[in-house]
Regions:
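Nucleotide-activated sugar donor-binding and catalytic core shared by glycosyltransferases
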Residues: 1-140
Length: 140
């Protein structure tokens, strides 16, 4: 299937509509899914639009290219770090950003999505659980 899938977790439908303009419809080639269960939808998505919280970490783990719209200070710091290493596209000012253009460009540019995905996967080494177990054992 040549359809592009956007994963939009934890972002209200009204914000998603703003991305595409309230009076326009999303292209029939684009499917938007907003489930908060990444293991069921995100891993099959071509692009994620997140707020820079836990869903961004889930997208990293799954290698899903991400556009981040941070809302809280901690999210802004995390998104700044991710964007500085090329793991996501940061949108620091949601109110003035041309999100439709940004999302459309990211969707249309396969090399950009592949680069974001590759860098995202490189930031996750899969050893977090082992390090936690080792730390807990060292305390016992």
């Amino acid at each position: 299937e040549s359809r592009i899938t956007l994963w939009v977790p934890r972002i209200h439908e009204q914000h998603t509509r703003r991305i595409w303009n309230s009076n326009s419809r999303v292209s029939p080639d684009i499917r938007i899914t907003s489930t908060n269960r990444p293991w069921t939808q995100a891993r099959y998505s071509d692009l994620a639009i997140t707020t820079g919280g836990q869903s961004s970490i889930e997208a990293l783990c799954l290698g899903v290219p991400t556009i981040a719209l941070p809302e809280l200070a901690a999210q802004k710091d995390f998104v700044y770090f991710l964007s500085s290493i090329g793991a996501c596209i940061s949108v620091p000012d949601f109110a003035t950003a041309d999100l439709r253009h940004l999302a459309t460009t990211a969707i249309a540019t396969k090399t950009l999505r592949e680069s974001l995905s590759r860098i995202a996967l490189q930031t996750i080494d899969g050893g977090g659980s082992s390090r936690i177990i080792d730390t807990v054992r060292s305390l016992i």
